[in-house]
């Protein structure tokens, strides 16, 4: 049973080492990133989380190591703790888009190991709290980091984490 799991992890490691560059020739995006809403015109655009080739290799190594350890210990699903991040990210984005309370906000989402980071702009503190509660209730979300800004915002693009 352990050999197929180790083989799967080795294939995952090889795939993680070869991501496709997304924006610039020397940057890579490993985690799913999506804009859910765009209703706050004054909100600066959030840039996706990108890595240099060196950062990407270090991240790939630690991700494979983490996945192998928890798989062998039986504390997580084999195949990596990042396996379901794209579907979690899409589900969270859809939930935000489908909730009328957030139509006047601009919200970007990044998911890493079932940890969801919210960035962008909301109108009120109450809206920020409601957004966080909505995201926490989504299936498979382990943790929410709500980095949204309330009200008027500073100018210039924000870098996603």
Question: Where does each model-flagged region fall?
Answer:
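N-terminal targeting leaders
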Residues: 2-161
């Amino acid at each position: 049973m352990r050999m197929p799991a180790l083989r799967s992890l080795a294939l995952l490691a090889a795939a993680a080492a070869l991501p496709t560059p997304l924006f610039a020739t020397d940057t890579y995006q490993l985690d799913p990133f999506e804009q859910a809403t765009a209703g706050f015109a004054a909100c600066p655009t959030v840039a996706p989380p990108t890595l240099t080739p060196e950062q990407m290799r270090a991240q790939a190594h630690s991700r494979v190591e983490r996945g192998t350890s928890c798989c062998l210990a039986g504390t997580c699903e084999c195949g990596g703790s990042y396996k379901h991040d794209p579907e979690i990210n899409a589900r969270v984005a859809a939930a935000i888009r489908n909730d009328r309370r957030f139509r006047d906000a601009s919200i970007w989402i990044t998911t890493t190991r079932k940890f969801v980071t919210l960035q962008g702009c909301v109108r009120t503190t109450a809206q920020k709290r409601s957004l966080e509660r909505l995201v926490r209730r989504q299936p498979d979300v382990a943790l929410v980091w709500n980095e949204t800004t309330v009200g008027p915002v500073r100018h210039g693009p924000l870098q996603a984490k």
